Swiss-Prot record:
Organism the protein comes from: Candida albicans (strain SC5314 / ATCC MYA-2876)
Keyword Cell inner membrane: no
Major localisation: secreted
PANTHER family assigned: CYSTEINE-RICH SECRETORY PROTEIN-RELATED
Task of the protein: Secreted protein that acts as a virulence factor during infections.
Glycosylation site list: 58, 152
Keywords: Glycoprotein, Secreted, Signal, Virulence
Keyword Secreted: yes
GO CC field: extracellular space
Record's signal peptide: 1-20
The SCP domain, residue ranges: 66-179
Protein name in UniProt: Probable pathogenesis-related protein CaO19.2336
GO BP field: sexual reproduction
Length: 202
């Protein structure tokens, strides 16, 4: 399964290179083995206000990312996320180390992780969410950016960014979002990814 996932991700990356698009997205942390008792974990959330860590927190960016994530989750009756300084610190450290190459590689940490390059903050979330357009609810076979965003058991979020100057895109944003508990747990999507609530759709 891990080998097939790796091949799938590599094909996506190759396709994006062939198409020649600067914008790219990627998701990490597909859990292949998990005990039911470990699915519900404590919340890391402590809010945006009062952050006193070592990284600069752009509160406008943080509030926007949290709001847009929760707007998407509300459409699927998923519980709202809360901001986590621990996740923000993790995402910030990883973003700071990015070489601005345009190649997306994951941190390999214990959190769920969405990456984007060349998108605006809202554009990144829209691109991730749009992968759910053809999603078959109740399926246990598809796990992507969309399912990561709306995964009901996830309760904490931390996002960071780095501004990159490239030959094709000045001030392109590299965006990292970390999620906890990580979603996309094989065998649990039907319990965590719910259909659109028709009452919430305009």
């Amino acid at each position: 399964m891990k080998t097939l996932l790796f091949i799938y991700l590599q094909l996506l990356l190759l396709l994006s290179i062939i198409i020649g698009r600067v914008v790219k997205v990627e998701y990490l942390h597909l859990v292949v083995e998990v005990e039911p008792s470990t699915i519900t974990e404590s919340c890391l959330s402590d809010g945006i206000d009062g952050y006193s860590g070592s990284f600069y927190l752009n509160t406008t960016f943080a509030e926007l990312m949290l709001k847009e994530h929760n707007n998407k989750r509300k459409l699927h009756q998923s519980c709202p996320l809360k901001w986590s300084s621990e996740l923000f610190n993790y995402a910030s450290q990883f973003a700071a180390e990015y070489s601005c190459s345009g190649i997306l590689q994951h941190s390999g940490g214990k959190y769920g992780e969405n990456l984007a390059f060349g998108y605006s903050p809202i554009g990144a979330i829209e691109a991730w969410y749009d992968e759910g357009e053809m999603y078959v609810y109740g399926s246990e076979n598809v796990y992507n950016h969309f399912t990561a965003i709306v995964w009901n058991n996830t309760n904490s979020l931390g996002c960071a960014y780095k501004s990159c100057d490239t030959t094709t895109n000045l001030n392109a944003l590299y965006i990292v979002c970390s999620y906890y508990p990580p979603g996309n747990v094989i065998g649990y999507s039907s319990q965590n990814v719910f259909p659109l609530n028709s009452k919430m759709v305009n």
